[in-house]
Amino acid sequence: MSLEPIPAGTTLIIRHGRALLPRGDWHEPDAVDIAIAGNVIAGVASGFARVADASIDEIDARGHLVLPGFVNAHYHSHDVLAKGTLEEVPLESWRLYALPPQYPPRSMEEVRARTLLGALECLRCGMTTIQDMLTLYPFEERHLDTVMQAYERIGIRVVFSLQYADRRGLETIPYWKDIFPKELHAQLSTAAEPERQIDLLGYFERTCLAAPSRSRVHWALGPSAPERCSPALMTRTMELARRYGVPVYSHIYESRGMALQARLTLPEQGGSLIKRLAAEGALGPLLNLAHSVWLARDEIDLLAATGTGVVLNPQGNLKMKCGIPPIRALQDAGVRIGLGCDNCSCSDAQNMFMAMKLFALLAAASDPLPGPPQAIAALRAATEAGAEGACLGNAIGRIEPGYKADLTLIDMSDPTWSPLNNAARQLVHVEAGRGVRHVIVNGAVVVRDRRLTTIDEDEIYDAVEIVMPGFRRDFAAICERVKRLQPWLDQAHQRMVSTELEFDRIYRPF
């Protein structure tokens, strides 16, 4: 075999890894060498010549798969410390346990620890890019600075947005205002509440969108959900997105309650949030709608016609009784589908392998007729589609010269891979994350031999343990408060699930 010369400027070579190349066979990928120059992929070849140059790092990837780094297209770092705390809690009640408006102001130490811990978990599971839709409530500039410094230090790529709203959560959940006594209304909130002290969107434009770019930090806009944002706020959001060329992430139809709220409050748009967004000119390729569980067929057609994307989060949607998204209908319509792992308090794990497997299984279970190969579809959702939704489709999500060197190497010396019958299917249906050995972000090896290289991992774990007594104390107080609210929560939830909609997304065997 003739060897190709090493591209000029090469700083790192990955040798002999089976790589998922854009035009390659992902079921039986070929072994190749990948040359990286600085932060970009400089070349891919069946073999590059060896040179005696101590400045070039080499990774022997024999017995490894090389993947584009996963893109976690929907994530919230504000509740990383709450993993494993909840189950059998419907979405509307979950918000009262887990989300920042219910908590006292947090310390900078806690904000730093949770940001680093969440990023560490993502990196160790092969994610090189995360879309952090962060709620800081009440907003403190020093907390935002702390978050950005943590991301810069740990070395992950982040598509960052602050989550904002201008309508109170109480006004956006069916039946709450009628059922709860007025004296309890102040205790009710949702994902983001209106900021009284600051124009959060204006602040974000001045300090982030209009600021000099950073190598691994990309900006996005995060209107919490259409029902929580006035038409004026959504219009302003989309104007900024188009002016600065940044993506927009918002929640839509995560639960039956969110779909019901649209039916109750939008008669002029046929009870449809999607039609409301269309009327406001918000639909289009810049918009990513997280969850999308309770979409109607004509709404799916609108998304497809406008190039609007969705981000599915199957783990949390199942755990919080939200339902099964219409995956096959979205695929058949040609809607862009990204994948996310959502909150640690509902999905619990930032694990893209779990998300991909659930995606493939739910797609299979949602239609009795054979459809597209779901392992390949899941992998593309976790890489290319997430990159496209972030307006980074020409920079990440593919192993191709000119793209950023964001790569994950999977060690196949494991029962998961013996025998190796089909790389794509075993990645999605068998691998659980144990095989992630090396992770490269922006050309830098940030995980080597399963250990973080940028920060001592024990430093992160120690910082978490220091802040956990305060977090647990506050969480216990919240649990007591929600316990007192439970009779009215149960009444509202029962009314929500008993109100008929034109279709269902919950599996009911009898």
What are these regions (language model features)?
Residues 83-157, 197-214, 465-470:
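Alpha-helical scaffold segments that flank or form the walls of functional sites
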Residues 458, 462, 466, 479, ...:
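C-terminal regulatory/interaction regions
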Residues 81-113, 167-192, 256-284, 306-309, ...:
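Active-site gating loops and adjacent loop-to-helix segments of metal-dependent hydrolytic enzymes
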Residues 1-53, 64-65:
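N-terminal metal-binding scaffold of metallo-dependent hydrolase/deaminase domains
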Residues 404-461:
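C-terminal cap of metal-dependent C-N hydrolases
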Residues 142-292:
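Metal-coordinating catalytic core of metallo-dependent amide/deamination hydrolases
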Residues 279-283, 328-417, 430:
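His/Asp/Glu-enriched, well-ordered alpha-helical/loop segment
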